C-alpha cells in the first residue's frame, strides 16, 4: 500500500496551505467572543431546541469551520451553559471556529431508568435534535450565511452523554444498523419522524459531519464504525466506568444499555482504517471534563482536539453549498515515505481519501 501511495505522489499537485490559517484554528488569536441564542428547530419551539452560537469578536473572515458541542447529564439532566460547554465553545471560537452549544430533548430519571426502550428513544431523539442543528447551519448558509461558515466543514462532539450523541449521529448510517432484538429499535424510529433524520426540522439539507469529538463518550455497538466513516478523536480516562472505557452498562447501572468507550472504539477504527487518535488519561475517571478550564486535563483535551482537527481543515478555500459530498472522507495522513503521521509544519503531508484521491499539502508556519 505504501508503494501505491508513493506512485500516486508523482501525479499530485502541491497545495501550499499558508494560513489564511496563519495560527487560526490552533492558537486563541481572538480576545473575546459573541454568544447568540437561537432556536435551531423550525418546527419545535421550546427550550430543548435552543442553541448558543459563539463567534470571535473582530473577525472579518468568512467560510469558517463549525463545531457543535453537546452537554452531558445522563440524558435526563444538563444544559447548554454547563461549564465545559461554555469553556469549549469559547476556546475554539477564540481560535477562529464558529462553535455552538445546544440543548436537546431529555427524559426523566425515572422514565430513563425504568425502560431500555425509553433509553433508545431518548438517544434517538437527541441524535435527531443534533442533526437538525447541523442542518440549521447549512440552511442558514444557503439563505444569507449569517455566521460566515463553511458548510462543508462541520464537526460534532460533546462530553459524556453529549459524546454519546455525537458518536451515534456519525456512526449509525442506516436504519438497518439498529437492532431488532431483544428490542426492535428500528420500529422505535417511528417515534422520531420515521427515519434517522428525525422530527426536528430543517429538512432538505445534509446532516453529515466531517469529524467526531468524544470527551468520555461511547457507542452502544462499535461495529457501527466502518471503513467509510468520519475521523474520530476521543479523550477518556482509563478508569471511567460511567461510560466504560471498554464496554459496560451506562452510568455503571445494570438497568442501562451498554456503552463502549475509547478502549474499544479506537481498535475498531484502526481495523477498518479510518483516521483516528486517542488521548488516554491513565488512572482517571469520568469527571475530568465537567469543570472545564479549571482542570488541566480539559486544557490538554482542547489542545489534543485542536491538533487533530487542524489537518482536516480546508483553510478558507471557496465553498458552495452544492459541493457538499458525504462520500469523500479523509482516512489517513502520511509523509513522503508513506508513514502515518500527525500534522507537521513545513513538511509535505499527503492526505489519503476513501475515494482513492490524494492531496499533498505543505503547512507553512
Regions found by a protein language model. Name each.
Residues 263-317:
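C-terminal catalytic histidine-bearing segment of alpha/beta-hydrolase fold enzymes
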Residues 93, 230, 235-282:
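Active-site-adjacent alpha-helix of alpha/beta-hydrolase-fold enzymes
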Residues 63-73:
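Short beta-strand element of the alpha/beta-hydrolase
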Residues 311-340:
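Residue-level detector of functionally pivotal "anchor" positions at catalytic/ligand-binding pockets or at interdomain
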Residues 20-62:
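N-terminal cap/lid segment of alpha/beta-hydrolase-fold proteins
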Residues 81-102:
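Short amphipathic alpha-helix adjacent to the substrate-entry channel of hydrolases
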Residues 75-84, 103-124, 287-293:
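Cap/lid segment of the alpha/beta-hydrolase catalytic domain
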Residues 58-62, 115-128, 132-159, 175-179:
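Gly/Ser-rich "nucleophile elbow"/oxyanion-hole loop immediately N-terminal to the catalytic nucleophile
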Amino acid at each position: 500500500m505504501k508503494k501505491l501511495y508513493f506512485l500516486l505522489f508523482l501525479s499530485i499537485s502541491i497545495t501550499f496551505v499558508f494560513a489564511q490559517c496563519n495560527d487560526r484554528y490552533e492558537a486563541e488569536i481572538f480576545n473575546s467572543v459573541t454568544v447568540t441564542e437561537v432556536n435551531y428547530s423550525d418546527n419545535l419551539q421550546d427550550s430543548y431546541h435552543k442553541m448558543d452560537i459563539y463567534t470571535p469578536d473582530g473577525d472579518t473572515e468568512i467560510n469558517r469551520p463549525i463545531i457543535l458541542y453537546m452537554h452531558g447529564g445522563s440524558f435526563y439532566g444538563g444544559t447548554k451553559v454547563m461549564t465545559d460547554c461554555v469553556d469549549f465553545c469559547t476556546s475554539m471560537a477564540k481560535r477562529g471556529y464558529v462553535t455552538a452549544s445546544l440543548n436537546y430533548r431529555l427524559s426523566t430519571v425515572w422514565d430513563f431508568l425504568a425502560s431500555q426502550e425509553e433509553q433508545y428513544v431518548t438517544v434517538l431523539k437527541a441524535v435527531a435534535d443534533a442533526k437538525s442543528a447541523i442542518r440549521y447551519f447549512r440552511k442558514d448558509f444557503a439563505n444569507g450565511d449569517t455566521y460566515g461558515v463553511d458548510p462543508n466543514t462541520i464537526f460534532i462532539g460533546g462530553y459524556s452523554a453529549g459524546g454519546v450523541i455525537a458518536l451515534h449521529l456519525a456512526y449509525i448510517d442506516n436504519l438497518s444498523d439498529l437492532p431488532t432484538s431483544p428490542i426492535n429499535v428500528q420500529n422505535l424510529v417511528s417515534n422520531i419522524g420515521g427515519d434517522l433524520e428525525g422530527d426536528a426540522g430543517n429538512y432538505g439539507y445534509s446532516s453529515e459531519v466531517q469529524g467526531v469529538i468524544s470527551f468520555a463518550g461511547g457507542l452502544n455497538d462499535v461495529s457501527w464504525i466502518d471503513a467509510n466513516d468520519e475521523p474520530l478523536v476521543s479523550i477518556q480516562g482509563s478508569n471511567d466506568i460511567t461510560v466504560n472505557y471498554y464496554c459496560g452498562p451506562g452510568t455503571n447501572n445494570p438497568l442501562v444499555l451498554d456503552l463502549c468507550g475509547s478502549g474499544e472504539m479506537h481498535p475498531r477504527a484502526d481495523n477498518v482504517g479510518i483516521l483516528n487518535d486517542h488521548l488516554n488519561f491513565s488512572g482517571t475517571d469520568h469527571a475530568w471534563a465537567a469543570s472545564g478550564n479549571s482542570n488541566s486535563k480539559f486544557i490538554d483535551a482542547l489542545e489534543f482536539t485542536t491538533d487533530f482537527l487542524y489537518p482536516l481543515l480546508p483553510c478558507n478555500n471557496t465553498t458552495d453549498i452544492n459541493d457538499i459530498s458525504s462520500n469523500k472522507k479523509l482516512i489517513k495522513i502520511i509523509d513522503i515515505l508513506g508513514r502515518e503521521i500527525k500534522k507537521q509544519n513545513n513538511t509535505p503531508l499527503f492526505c489519503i481519501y476513501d475515494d482513492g484521491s490524494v492531496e499533498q499539502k505543505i503547512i507553512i508556519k
